[in-house]
Structure formats: structure tokens, C-alpha cells
A protein has these predicted regions:
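Acidic, polar-rich low-complexity tracts and alpha-helical solenoid repeat scaffolds
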Residues: 2-6, 14-267
Length: 267
């Protein structure tokens, strides 16, 4: 009986809540809707808050409250994890209120929303690049902001995502090998460019390992007149690699490479 009574009480509260929300939707009092929207927002009922704010946004257009409504609409979409829409609303806020009271938050969230929305490294990375650009603008404008540390952290992760994409590309070229051309050379170029463009990325050993492998394969498959030069080049790369990564998980394999290299260089 107690359990049934509790369920009935919950049902009554739910129906009352729904009835109140439906009444608010029909209300002609913008102030009542605004205050209710803030209450729903604080209760994390973002869809209800967003709906009410959308309904009154045109009424308050051009007023001081319009700024608050735009900021809260962006927050509502953020709360719903609708990052693309949140980005658009925060961007709209920055355009309309570049020095507004929510400007610091809005500039940060333009980057953060796109950071949250950035796809897997195998996919197109335009959103990732947009997020980096937004964070760059943010830290230039607000270097002392409480959000600055998080912006730098997330920007570093975004750069790593771009580097990971280049790692996938370099690995793909390596796997293609000599199919329809010298893909080992392409692998080497992509890996070197990634190290240049993303000098602090966390995949540096992986890139350097691919470079060494690519050089080694080009040596092995080289015509005789180029083999000695390529062997010496690969040997230099070997020493660079083991100097930088003496405890690399690839050390045994690199040492086997050196044996084959020395058969050519006669050293």
C-alpha cells in the first residue's frame, strides 16, 4: 500500500509539473516565462528552459534582457549536449555583445563546444581546426581568465588529434608500400611534416619509427646504384632514433635493421 501511495504521489507531482509547464507555454506574460525559464535551467530541465526562452526572445529583442536570453539559450543547448547549436548561439553572442557580461564565457565556449563536437581523428577535422582557432583567439583576449588553463589543455588535445590523423595517413602510405609508386617516400614526407607542424605531439616516437621504417624499405628495394647512399641515410636515421628513444619497444627490430644496413655499408 505504501509503495502504491508513493507511486500515485509521484504521478500527481508529474502531472502537476506538466500542467504548470503547459500553462506557461500559453501564458502571455513574458516576464513570467523568463523567470520560469531560469528556474527550469537551474533544475537542468534544459529543453523546457530553451522552449520558453525561444518563445520570448523576439519580445525582448533590443533590450538589455536580450543579452541574457541569448546567453542562456547557448547554455541550454550546451546542457543538452547539442554542441553545434550551442556553438552557433555562443558565436551569435560574441558578434552581438563582444564586450558583454558573458563575453569571456562565450569566447571560451565557442572553442569548448567544438572541442566536444570534434570527430574521430580518421574523419574530416575542420571542426577541430575551428576549435583551435577559437581557443587561440580566446587566450589572446583573456590570458588571465580562469578558463585559460582548460583552453590550453583542450587545445593541446586537439593538436594531438590532428597529429593522430597524420599518423594514420603516414601509416597508410607505409602499408601501401610500392603499390602504384613509392609510397614509402610519401610516408616519410607526411611523418616529417607532422613533426614539424605539431612539435609537441604525443606521437613523436611513432612518427620517427615510421620514418626509419620507410627509409629502410627504400634501401632494401633500391636499385644497386642508389643502395649505398640509402643505406648510409638509413643508418644515420637509426642512430638518431636510438639516441632519442634508447628504451624504445622497437629496439630489437631496429638493431636487426642495423645488421642488414652494415652488410651494405661494409662497416
Amino acid at each position: 500500500m505504501r509503495k502504491n501511495g508513493f507511486i500515485i504521489l509521484l504521478l500527481m507531482l508529474f502531472l502537476t509539473s506538466c500542467g504548470e509547464y503547459q500553462r506557461l507555454l500559453k501564458s502571455r506574460d513574458p516576464e513570467e516565462k523568463y523567470q520560469a525559464a531560469l528556474q527550469y535551467f537551474n533544475q537542468k530541465e534544459y529543453v523546457k528552459a530553451q522552449t520558453l526562452l525561444d518563445d520570448i526572445s523576439s519580445y525582448y529583442k533590443g533590450t538589455e534582457r536580450s543579452e541574457d536570453i541569448l546567453a542562456y539559450l547557448a547554455r541550454c543547448y550546451m546542457g543538452q549536449k547539442a554542441y553545434e547549436s550551442a556553438t552557433e548561439y555562443y558565436q551569435a553572442y560574441v558578434r552581438n555583445y563582444p564586450k558583454g557580461k558573458y563575453a569571456t564565457e562565450a569566447h571560451f565556449q565557442v572553442g569548448h563546444c567544438q572541442y566536444m563536437d570534434a570527430p574521430d581523428a580518421r574523419l574530416d577535422q575542420q571542426i577541430t581546426q575551428n576549435a583551435i582557432q577559437a581557443f587561440t583567439i580566446f587566450v589572446e583576449l583573456y590570458p588571465e581568465s580562469p578558463y585559460a588553463e582548460q583552453a590550453y589543455t583542450e587545445m593541446s588535445e586537439l593538436y594531438d588529434k590532428l597529429a593522430r590523423k597524420e599518423l594514420y595517413n603516414a601509416q597508410l602510405y607505409y602499408n601501401l608500400g610500392s603499390y602504384l609508386g613509392n609510397n614509402y617516400a610519401s610516408c616519410e614526407i607526411v611523418a616529417k611534416n607532422a613533426l614539424k607542424n605539431y612539435p609537441s605531439n604525443k606521437f613523436q616516437e611513432d612518427f620517427n619509427w615510421l620514418i626509419l621504417q620507410a627509409k629502410y624499405q627504400q634501401m632494401v628495394q633500391s636499385v644497386e646504384e642508389k643502395k649505398l647512399d640509402r643505406a648510409r641515410d638509413t643508418q644515420d636515421e637509426y642512430y638518431n632514433f636510438i639516441t632519442e628513444y634508447p628504451d624504445s619497444k622497437h629496439r630489437k627490430e631496429t638493431d636487426k635493421m642495423l645488421i642488414q644496413i652494415r652488410k651494405i655499408t661494409k662497416e
